[in-house]
Design a protein with these regions (language model features):
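Glycine-rich Rossmann-fold phosphate-binding loop(s) that bind the pyrophosphate
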Residues: 120-123
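Core beta-strand elements of the Rossmann-like FAD/NAD(P) dinucleotide-binding domain
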Residues: 69-78, 196-205, 216
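Flavin (primarily FAD) cofactor-binding/catalytic cores of flavoenzymes
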Residues: 54, 176-179, 193-198, 219
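Glycine-rich flavin
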Residues: 1-114, 141, 146-150, 156-157, ...
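Residues at the starts of beta-strands that form the adenosine-phosphate
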Residues: 116, 138-141, 171
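N-terminal Rossmann-fold NAD(P) dinucleotide-binding loop
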Residues: 126-127
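Flavin (primarily FAD) binding-site architecture
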Residues: 82-95, 209-223
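Gly/Ala-rich phosphate-binding loop of Rossmann-like dinucleotide-binding domains
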Residues: 130, 134-135
């Protein structure tokens, strides 16, 4: 889309639009095909797939509650917990406001394009969404508390990526700590502190992409 819109210099002319709702619908259809393919691979490998909510009840024992509420116990010499992860929402005032989303919520899809978005967190998820939305013509502000983007990786990589994003029109703010998010008449206002100075950036939406944690909620029996 970005190349087509900006293709006049290469002799590409014409009017082009996008439907973000259809884009997310396509994303969901691809994900569903991948899930179906994985199920087929597991079936071919003679792996029993049991649907339900699991809880480790005792060493070597897992209770699974099915959709009908019935509980079935399964036993094994070893148990591997591969329950995935969930988004982290730190205790920052305003992160509970409407329009503040996690990456999971954002991936559920949007009906209308966003004109502007503030992304809190310059890790892998935040950088990916910054690149995605900037290519769609959205005004993007990317906020990272550490000195560089992708702080878990080599410093040079984060610095180079910041330059690439800036060339795409992304406003990159590093060493910037979010103090609060407020609802205003023009959208959402994110108040920051950067090297002793107070800043404020605004957006139609705010994406909280600070990180994820392992999901173990309810996995272990209380006793």
């Amino acid at each position: 889309y970005h190349d087509a819109v900006n293709g006049a210099g290469m002799g590409v002319h014409g009017s082009i639009t996008y439907d973000i709702g259809e884009m997310f619908a396509f994303k969901r259809s691809v994900s569903e095909k991948l899930r179906s393919g994985i199920h087929a691979l597991l079936k071919g490998a003679k792996v029993d797939v049991i649907e339900g909510t699991a809880q480790i009840a005792a060493p070597g024992a897992v209770d699974v509650t099915g959709a009908d509420g019935a509980v079935t116990r399964y036993t094994a010499a070893y148990i591997l917990a591969a329950t995935g992860s969930v988004n982290v929402r730190p205790p920052i005032p305003g992160l509970e406001l409407p329009g503040v989303m996690t990456s999971d919520e954002l991936l559920e899809g949007a009906d209308t394009p966003y004109q502007s978005i503030v992304i809190i967190g310059g890790g892998v998820i935040g950088v990916e969404f910054a690149a995605f939305f900037s290519q769609l013509g959205c005004r993007v502000t990317l906020v990272e508390g550490m000195a560089n983007l992708l702080p878990q990786l080599d410093r040079e990589l984060g610095q180079n990526l910041a330059q690439i994003l800036k060339k795409q029109g992304v406003e990159v703010l590093t060493s910037a700590m979010v103090q609060s998010v407020e609802q205003t008449a023009g959208g959402l206002c994110v108040r920051l502190e950067q090297k002793g100075k107070e800043l404020a950036v605004t957006g139609e939406r705010v994406l909280c992409a600070i990180g994820r944690r392992a999901y173990f909620d309810g996995l272990f029996a209380a006793d």
